[in-house]
């Protein structure tokens, strides 16, 4: 069993000690917005009520991670930009092996960074766990049917963000996605399956497009088959949005071949793509500072957003 799988098991095992059996809530001043007006489509049973777990024994960047699981009512939380508004927005998709959501490490931490750069952040709390409930290290490539509920949540959120563009002071042509690990896989899925409607329209928001204007999958999983080919459930084409990839070569959960195979497919399709590989960094580092050079990836991402015209060049 790989370390990330072990970590998930430890979170589950320690839940009786560290869990707060309450639904995760954002900090004061922010409100979760249900993304479905009623019950979500393809609703699956989960092992118990939604919970958030804090494990002080497992620190990442000197801080514990908050894990959310058993999500049946997906929500989005909007974080307005600080200072000058660039008009850009990013839907942030935390990872967690489709079993939990690393809601702070790969969620609120990211929103703090994005909003400090004048970018609206929309944090998606999508449905987990997927069936089967037990994460298995040999379950790659991730079957599209297993992530349909999560991908439905991503499609719906993209459309809702554009539907609220005027209200939230967002340019509807500058709406992107950023995700980590399993969330990185969802970034690749929404980047290549946006023309595939996965649920019946529920309101006028669903008349809009779910295609991201840019995509940032970080240490993504489930993209490479065992023989080194691209997961066929991620049909890259010339319509796939510009993409920014980051991964560590010593990623012990989702090997670097995940990014390499996706980069190759994007390049062959003439999709603008930028990839940064680092010798060290492991997996699930988020934005928390470390001594490794990979900790500087946010500055590279910000520069990339400028080069593709999503935000102004720094200092202008």
Each model region followed by its residue ranges:
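Conserved alpha/beta-hydrolase "acid-adjacent" motif
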Residues: 252-258
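Short amphipathic alpha-helix adjacent to the substrate-entry channel of hydrolases
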Residues: 104-122
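N-terminal cap/lid segment of alpha/beta-hydrolase-fold proteins
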Residues: 21-85, 116
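C-terminal catalytic histidine-bearing segment of alpha/beta-hydrolase fold enzymes
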Residues: 260-316
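Cap/lid segment of the alpha/beta-hydrolase catalytic domain
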Residues: 97-106, 123-149, 191-195, 199, ...
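Short beta-strand/loop motif that positions the catalytic acidic residue
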Residues: 239, 245-247
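Short beta-strand element of the alpha/beta-hydrolase
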Residues: 86-95
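Primarily recognizes the serine-hydrolase "nucleophile elbow" in alpha/beta-hydrolase
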Residues: 149-238
């Amino acid at each position: 069993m790989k370390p990330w799988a072990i970590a998930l098991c430890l979170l589950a095992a320690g839940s009786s000690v560290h869990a707060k059996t309450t639904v995760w809530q954002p900090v004061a001043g922010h409100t979760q917005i249900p993304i479905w007006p009623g019950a979500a489509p393809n609703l699956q049973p989960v092992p118990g009520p939604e919970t958030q777990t804090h494990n002080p024994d497992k620190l990442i960047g000197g801080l514990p991670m908050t894990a959310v699981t058993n999500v049946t009512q997906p929500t989005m939380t909007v974080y307005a930009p600080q200072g000058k508004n660039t008009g850009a927005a990013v839907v942030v998709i935390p990872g967690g092996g489709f079993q939990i959501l690393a809601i702070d490490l790969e969620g609120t931490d990211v929103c703090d960074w994005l909003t400090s750069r004048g970018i609206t952040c929309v944090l998606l709390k999508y449905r987990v766990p997927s069936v089967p409930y037990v994460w298995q290290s040999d379950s790659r490539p991730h079957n599209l049917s297993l992530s349909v509920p999560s991908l439905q949540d991503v499609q719906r959120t993209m459309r809702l963000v554009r539907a609220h563009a005027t209200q939230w002071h967002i340019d509807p042509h500058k709406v992107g996605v950023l995700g980590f690990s399993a969330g990185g896989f969802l970034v690749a899925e929404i980047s290549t399956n946006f023309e595939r409607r996965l649920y019946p329209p529920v309101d006028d928001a669903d008349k809009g497009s779910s295609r991201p204007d840019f995509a940032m999958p970080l240490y993504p999983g489930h993209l490479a088959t065992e023989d080194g080919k691209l997961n066929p459930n991620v049909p890259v084409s010339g319509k796939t949005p510009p993409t920014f990839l980051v991964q560590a070569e010593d990623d012990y959960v989702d090997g670097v071949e995940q990014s390499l195979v996706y980069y190759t497919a994007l390049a062959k399709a003439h999709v603008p793509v930028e990839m940064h590989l680092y010798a060290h960094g492991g997996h699930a580092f988020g934005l928390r500072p470390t001594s490794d050079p990979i900790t500087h990836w946010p500055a590279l991402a910000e520069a990339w957003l400028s080069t593709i015209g999503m935000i102004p060049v720094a200092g202008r």
